[in-house]
């Protein structure tokens, strides 16, 4: 029994050690990407692998642009649509999380997540789309790293450049060119609001650009944009 207990203790210490090494590895990338633009996120790599199963030579559409070359309308639209308290919270919108939990409980299934921009970025940079308790814990840890080591402006800049906006389309510049044949800097208010409305389900809206639901979301986002605070 003592031998078994000793082995269990060693196993536990080993798992803790691996967990800490993993966190240090993540921390290293977070520190680097605070100054260097990410080339490819974990989520982008997953989507590219999926595309290449059907088309081996497939490539993602993505072009990095500095924060200053992204339309203020798109910045306001994303804040209005995804995270109205972004500039004020420290990574987590507890009120939004509570509302999402109540909505899920009422529906009896998962229909809302309540994730902030920082949480969404943490998932996109490092994690897989699979849902698990470990993944939620990891997401929270990475979110805290981002919030404490990056400025809000840097978080938002990276987010706008790496989020999915269609089938193989990532980032504001690629989205602007894919849908409107213009640059991210030249997006108007309605174009920006429509792009922001696509964020929760971009591949669906890429296929169904005239969806009625998207039109309603666009109108709501447009109405909220003047009150949106951007970093």
Swiss-Prot record:
Its EC number is 2.4.99.28. PANTHER family: BIOSYNTHETIC PEPTIDOGLYCAN TRANSGLYCOSYLASE, MONOFUNCTIONAL BIOSYNTHETIC PEPTIDOGLYCAN TRANSGLYCOSYLASE. Pathway: Cell wall biogenesis; peptidoglycan biosynthesis. Peptidoglycan polymerase that catalyzes glycan chain elongation from lipid-linked precursors. This is Biosynthetic peptidoglycan transglycosylase. The chain crosses the membrane at residues 10-30. Keywords: Cell inner membrane, Cell membrane, Cell shape, Cell wall biogenesis/degradation, Glycosyltransferase, Membrane, Peptidoglycan synthesis, Transferase, Transmembrane, Transmembrane helix. It is a single-pass membrane protein. One of its GO terms (molecular function) is pentosyltransferase activity. One of its GO terms (cellular component) is plasma membrane. It is found in: Cell inner membrane. Belongs to the glycosyltransferase 51 family. HAMAP family: PGT_MtgA. It catalyses: [GlcNAc-(1->4)-Mur2Ac(oyl-L-Ala-gamma-D-Glu-L-Lys-D-Ala-D-Ala)](n)-di-trans,octa-cis-undecaprenyl diphosphate + beta-D-GlcNAc-(1->4)-Mur2Ac(oyl-L-Ala-gamma-D-Glu-L-Lys-D-Ala-D-Ala)-di-trans,octa-cis-undecaprenyl diphosphate = [GlcNAc-(1->4)-Mur2Ac(oyl-L-Ala-gamma-D-Glu-L-Lys-D-Ala-D-Ala)](n+1)-di-trans,octa-cis-undecaprenyl diphosphate + di-trans,octa-cis-undecaprenyl diphosphate + H(+).
């Amino acid at each position: 029994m003592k031998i078994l207990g000793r082995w269990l203790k060693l196993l536990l210490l080993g798992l803790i050690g691996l967990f800490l090494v993993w966190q240090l590895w993540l921390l290293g990338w977070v520190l680097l990407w605070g100054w260097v633009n990410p080339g490819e996120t974990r989520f982008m790599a997953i989507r590219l692998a999926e595309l290449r199963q059907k088309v081996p030579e497939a490539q993602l559409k993505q072009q990095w642009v500095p924060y200053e070359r992204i339309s203020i309308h798109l910045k306001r639209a994303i804040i209005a649509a995804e995270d109205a308290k972004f500039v004020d919270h420290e990574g987590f919108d507890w009120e939004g999380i509570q509302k999402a939990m109540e909505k899920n409980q009422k529906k009896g299934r998962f229909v809302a997540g309540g994730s902030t921009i920082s949480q969404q970025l943490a998932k996109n940079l490092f994690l897989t789309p699979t849902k698990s308790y470990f993944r939620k814990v990891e997401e929270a840890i990475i979110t805290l790293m981002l919030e404490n080591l990056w400025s809000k402006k840097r978080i938002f800049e990276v987010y706008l450049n790496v989020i999915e906006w269609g089938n193989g389309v990532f980032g504001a510049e690629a989205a602007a060119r894919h849908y409107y044949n213009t640059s991210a800097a030249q997006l108007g208010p309605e174009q920006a609001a429509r792009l922001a409305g696509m964020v929760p389900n971009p591949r669906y809206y890429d296929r169904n650009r005239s969806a009625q639901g998207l039109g309603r979301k666009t109108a709501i986002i447009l109405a909220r944009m003047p009150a949106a605070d951007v970093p």
